Amino acid sequence: MVAAAGLLGGCLVEIRHVDDPGAAFGQARAEASRLQGQPGPAHRVNVLVFDEGDHKLVRVSLPMWIAKKIQKDGEIDFGGDAGDLAEDVRPHLRLEDIEKAGLGILVEVEEDGGDQVLVWLS
């Protein structure tokens, strides 16, 4: 397992190799479901990606202020470790739309090949 936490701003990037991402996605869905419909602004953008081909599970969590800074300076880049599915979802994630969506699950995708993406606000 590789994990990195940015001290400045509280960013988290966690990369693990797993055979079954079910537990991680179940935990993430439960967290997002508890927040669904709650009042108040989002403070974090959370992304969980599983690449079936590489058996790679990537979790990214970043504060909204960093997401705003990233969008102002350019596009969101999940990095090469996030996989093709995350890069397919990325162009459809506009920060102004994300902020309007409210807390909880924003996007959930599961491809036939086993790749998965879950994006939620907390």
Predicted regions and their residues:
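Short, exposed beta-strand-loop hairpins at the edges of beta-sheets
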Residues: 98-100, 104-121
